[in-house]
From Swiss-Prot:
The keyword Transmembrane belongs to this UniProt entry's keyword annotation: no
Keyword list, A-Z: Acyltransferase, Amino-acid biosynthesis, Cytoplasm, Methionine biosynthesis, Transferase
Catalytic activity: L-homoserine + acetyl-CoA = O-acetyl-L-homoserine + CoA
Protein name in UniProt: Homoserine O-acetyltransferase
InterPro entries: Class_I_gatase-like, HST_MetA, MetA_family
Assigned protein family: Belongs to the MetA family.
Active-site feature positions: C142 (acyl-thioester intermediate), H235 (proton acceptor), E237
Site (Important for acyl-CoA specificity) residue list: E111
Protein's cellular compartments: Cytoplasm
Top-rank taxon, per record: Bacteria
CDD domains for the chain: GATase1_HTS
PANTHER family documented for this protein: HOMOSERINE O-SUCCINYLTRANSFERASE (PTHR20919:SF0)
Length: 301
């Protein structure tokens, strides 16, 4: 089944080239189907790239999804054309009287700041509070996961001596959790961050369950409130060349950055990246949508 997006959204052409089934809003209203309402709070400066990454994954399921893109009203986005935001995005004020089946909160390049120093922290707090009663399940990614763990449970983040950068092996910690249905006992996921949350802090919170971690990269997946909140510290949504682009960008800026681990063939940045995470990335998003959104949401929101 398709994802429903605006016919002029640039990501639509990218997805159609990859045979992802997309449908315009005009076509969707002719069908007698209650599509799942999914909001994506896009905190990334590379908005169009992030749109394509997430739509690619959530569009690869049998479910029909009505996608709403959100941006922060209290933050000026400098890396995206204003007409793109005006045409395709809403603010929290636009949707705060609605209910959603699912919400995705992305990462953001603000992790070296304390949460309270982030200029949109107050607005984000209102959205996360809203999600507790107006969203069936919320998936938090990378910094979005750190923010959610801190806001809802007081779990702190800690600076890393070096950037966690690359593709890392993870172990499943809980075998009988629906989010990990079909997962191998060991799987890969990308990470790209300067801070971490610690397993010991998550284990102190009885409402949280640690699902997967890595000896090298630390915590990757956790859930709270029986799946109403899902936290993914890695980037299972990343495209093949996302880490490559981040590495080249940092090199151009003159930053002292290591080659992303376990990513390039022979660990040589002049060679092609090796994708090890795509199947489990698709499985993570499809399991979230099926077991924690579709199976749990009421027909009438």
């Amino acid at each position: 089944m398709p994802i429903i997006i605006d016919k002029d959204l640039p990501a639509r052409k990218v997805l159609q080239k990859e045979n992802i089934f997309v449908m315009t809003k005009e076509r969707a209203v002719t069908q007698d189907i209650r599509a799942l309402k999914i909001a994506i709070l896009n905190l990334m400066p590379t908005k169009q790239e992030t749109e394509a990454q997430l739509l690619r994954l959530i569009g690869n399921t049998p479910l029909q999804l009505d996608v709403h893109l959100l941006h922060m009203e209290s933050h000026l986005s400098r890396n995206v054309a204003q007409d793109h935001l005006t045409s395709f995005y809403k603010t929290f004020r636009d949707i705060e009287d609605e209910k959603f089946d699912g919400l995705i909160i992305t990462g953001a390049p603000v992790e070296t700041l304390s949460f309270e120093e982030v200029d949109y922290w107050e607005e984000l707090g209102r959205i996360m509070e809203y999600s507790k009663t107006n969203v069936t399940s919320t998936l938090h990614i990378c910094w979005g996961a750190q923010a959610g763990l801190y806001y809802h449970y007081g779990v702190p983040k800690y600076p890393l001596a070096e950037k966690m950068f690359g593709v890392f092996e993870h172990e499943v910690r809980e075998q009988h959790v629906k989010l990990l249905q079909g997962f191998d006992e060991v799987f890969f996921a990308p990470h790209s961050r300067h801070t971490e949350v610690r397993e010991s802090d998550i284990e102190k919170v009885k409402e949280l369950t640690l699902l997967a971690n890595s000896e090298e990269a630390g915590v990757h997946l956790a859930i709270g409130q029986e799946g109403r909140q899902v936290f993914a510290l890695g980037h299972s949504e990343y495209s093949c060349d996302t880490l490559k682009q981040e590495y080249e960008r940092d090199c151009q800026r003159g930053l002292n950055i290591d080659v992303p681990k376990n990513y390039f063939k022979h660990n040589n940045p002049n060679e092609k990246p090796i994708v090890r995470w795509r199947s489990h990335g698709n499985l993570l998003f499809s399991n979230w949508l099926n077991y924690y959104v579709y199976q749990e949401t009421p027909y009438i929101l």
